[in-house]
């Protein structure tokens, strides 16, 4: 069994991570640490886990007791944690924050998008788990980027559920504002753009990214279009070839809906050609393929396990 610890255990991503790990056949959770919830029962915060576990949030931890550490703290806190703790030489770390995703700040962390870096991830000790928007958009465009077929402006509209804003309610995330409502935020400036442009190796000024707050809890529905000389048959073949060995990214010949991926680690892509424009739909669960599910996928890879272990999940399709 692989002994794991979690830092920052009170949020949505940590709650989903705990849910996945307690059902993972190769995992023993040693501690879940949370400053704000220390000594409370985990099921009192993550109420969906009632009957599944009896652990409490710890107020202390020993990194020498674990093999893998998941960092689920706020952006900025992971870097501070690494700087202020002695990390034993065998400890593997998977960070779910933004702190080590960019190349200039990586500090030995490998960018953990398996569809891009799977073989590098297998050999890595430290993983920077990608952002949710970044995951959806990169998976929509990677096959084109790797064939050097991105040659014009890219237009992206992506709508996300309220859980993407975190567990603490804000003026734009609590129910009475979010329900029956929709709004644009961080147009052209979203922090995930840098991840996207670095991985795709494409000029940042050619991305037109409009993130949208949706009136639902979870999931990302991204639409992407760009000019392309490919006909639809060739485009679908390029995508099918690229994702042929992917454990979780699939091409659908039918226009997908968000419920097909909610509660799963899947990304479903759909392609259409309209005149000279290639149109791509990319859908994921922001808390799973966009966060905790992808973290477990990376955990499996760095631990030499089957990539899909613990991630056979049923979609909320009905």
UniProtKB/Swiss-Prot annotation:
<dbReference type="GO" id="GO:0006526">
    <property type="term" value="P:L-arginine biosynthetic process"/>
</dbReference>
<dbReference type="InterPro" id="IPR000534">
    <property type="entry name" value="Semialdehyde_DH_NAD-bd"/>
</dbReference>
<comment type="similarity">
    <text>Belongs to the NAGSA dehydrogenase family. Type 1 subfamily.</text>
</comment>
<keyword id="KW-0560">Oxidoreductase</keyword>
<dbReference type="GO" id="GO:0051287">
    <property type="term" value="F:NAD binding"/>
</dbReference>
<feature type="active site">
    <location>
        <position position="132"/>
    </location>
</feature>
<keyword id="KW-0963">Cytoplasm</keyword>
<dbReference type="GO" id="GO:0070401">
    <property type="term" value="F:NADP+ binding"/>
</dbReference>
<dbReference type="GO" id="GO:0005737">
    <property type="term" value="C:cytoplasm"/>
</dbReference>
<dbReference type="Pfam" id="PF22698">
    <property type="entry name" value="Semialdhyde_dhC_1"/>
</dbReference>
<dbReference type="Pfam" id="PF01118">
    <property type="entry name" value="Semialdhyde_dh"/>
</dbReference>
<dbReference type="InterPro" id="IPR000706">
    <property type="entry name" value="AGPR_type-1"/>
</dbReference>
<dbReference type="InterPro" id="IPR036291">
    <property type="entry name" value="NAD(P)-bd_dom_sf"/>
</dbReference>
<keyword id="KW-0521">NADP</keyword>
<dbReference type="GO" id="GO:0003942">
    <property type="term" value="F:N-acetyl-gamma-glutamyl-phosphate reductase activity"/>
</dbReference>
<dbReference type="InterPro" id="IPR050085">
    <property type="entry name" value="NAGSA_dehydrogenase"/>
</dbReference>
<keyword id="KW-0055">Arginine biosynthesis</keyword>
<protein>
    <recommendedName>
        <fullName>N-acetyl-gamma-glutamyl-phosphate reductase</fullName>
        <ecNumber>1.2.1.38</ecNumber>
    </recommendedName>
</protein>
<keyword id="KW-0028">Amino-acid biosynthesis</keyword>
<dbReference type="InterPro" id="IPR023013">
    <property type="entry name" value="AGPR_AS"/>
</dbReference>
<comment type="pathway">
    <text>Amino-acid biosynthesis; L-arginine biosynthesis; N(2)-acetyl-L-ornithine from L-glutamate: step 3/4.</text>
</comment>
<comment type="function">
    <text>Catalyzes the NADPH-dependent reduction of N-acetyl-5-glutamyl phosphate to yield N-acetyl-L-glutamate 5-semialdehyde.</text>
</comment>
């Amino acid at each position: 069994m692989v002994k794991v610890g979690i830092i920052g255990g009170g949020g949505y991503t940590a709650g989903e991570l705990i849910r996945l790990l307690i059902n993972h056949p190769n995992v023993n959770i040693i501690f879940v640490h949370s400053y704000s919830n220390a000594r409370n029962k985990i099921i009192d915060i993550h109420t969906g886990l009632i009957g599944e576990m009896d652990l409490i949030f710890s107020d202390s931890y020993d990194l020498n007791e674990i093999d893998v550490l998941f960092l689920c703290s706020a952006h900025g806190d992971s870097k501070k944690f690494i700087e202020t703790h002695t990390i034993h030489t065998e400890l593997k770390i998977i960070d779910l924050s933004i702190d080590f995703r960019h190349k200039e700040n990586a500090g030995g962390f490998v960018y953990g998008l398996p569809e891009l870096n799977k073989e590098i991830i297998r050999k890595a000790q430290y993983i920077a788990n990608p952002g949710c928007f970044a995951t959806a958009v990169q998976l929509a465009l990677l096959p084109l980027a790797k064939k050097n077929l991105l040659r014009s402006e890219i237009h992206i509209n992506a709508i996300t559920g309220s859980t993407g804003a975190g567990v603490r309610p804000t003026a734009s995330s609590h129910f009475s504002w979010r329900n029956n409502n929709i709004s644009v935020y961080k147009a052209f400036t979203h922090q995930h753009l840098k991840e996207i442009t670095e991985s795709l190796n494409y000029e940042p000024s050619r991305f037109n990214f409009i993130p949208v707050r949706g009136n639902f809890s979870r999931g990302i529905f991204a639409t992407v279009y760009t000019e392309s000389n490919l006909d639809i048959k060739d485009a679908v073949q390029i995508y099918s070839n690229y994702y042929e060995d992917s454990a979780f990214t699939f091409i659908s010949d039918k226009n997908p809906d968000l419920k097909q991926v909610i509660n799963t680690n899947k990304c479903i892509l759909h392609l259409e050609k309209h005149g000279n424009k290639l149109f791509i739909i990319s859908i994921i669960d922001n808390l799973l393929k966009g966060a905790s599910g992808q973290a477990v996928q990376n955990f499996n890879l760095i631990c030499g396990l089957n990539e899909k272990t613990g991630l056979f999940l049923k979609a909320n399709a009905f």
